[in-house]
């Protein structure tokens, strides 16, 4: 999620990899170089301020949106275990500039979800998460029954994204919201 004040979460450490301190990272970013190119990064444990750490190396796991990275001074599996659920952040002033109609996928989180019925907007839920293993899916929590549904993030189903006004309009195929 984008914090307008300072930080953008670009990854989440999910587990260890091997015995030498490498960690697996679920990418929340379209920019793979954030996990491949050595340099300074920021880690954040829940409810604590971010701390600087150096990325030594990284590689993408084949067929996944998961990366394995090596961080400076993290040299054992035990130490790597302590980083589970830490967020990897970048400063918002380091976010690449986008074209007028573009947005960062993480900006979709917490947007209201509307359908258009008989020329009337009907708010049905909100975006609570993204899944992007192979294709981008919006995880939407429906207000009427508190169920979570997965909506493919494609133009045919999500024709309108209005970041400025905090909503999207979806056009789901029949039955998709009832699954």
Curated annotation (Swiss-Prot):
GO molecular function: ribosome binding
Family annotation (InterPro entries): PRC_barrel-like_sf, PRC_RimM, RimM, RimM_N, RimM_N_sf, Transl_B-barrel_sf
Residue ranges of domain PRC barrel in the record: 100-176
Locations listed in the record: Cytoplasm
Domain of life: Bacteria
One of the GO biological process terms: ribosomal small subunit biogenesis
Cellular component GO terms, alphabetical: cytoplasm; ribosome
Protein family membership: Belongs to the RimM family.
Function: An accessory protein needed during the final step in the assembly of 30S ribosomal subunit, possibly for assembly of the head region. Essential for efficient processing of 16S rRNA. May be needed both before and after RbfA during the maturation of 16S rRNA. It has affinity for free ribosomal 30S subunits but not for 70S ribosomes.
Quaternary data: Binds ribosomal protein uS19.
Protein name (record): Ribosome maturation factor RimM
Organism this protein belongs to: Prochlorococcus marinus (strain MIT 9215)
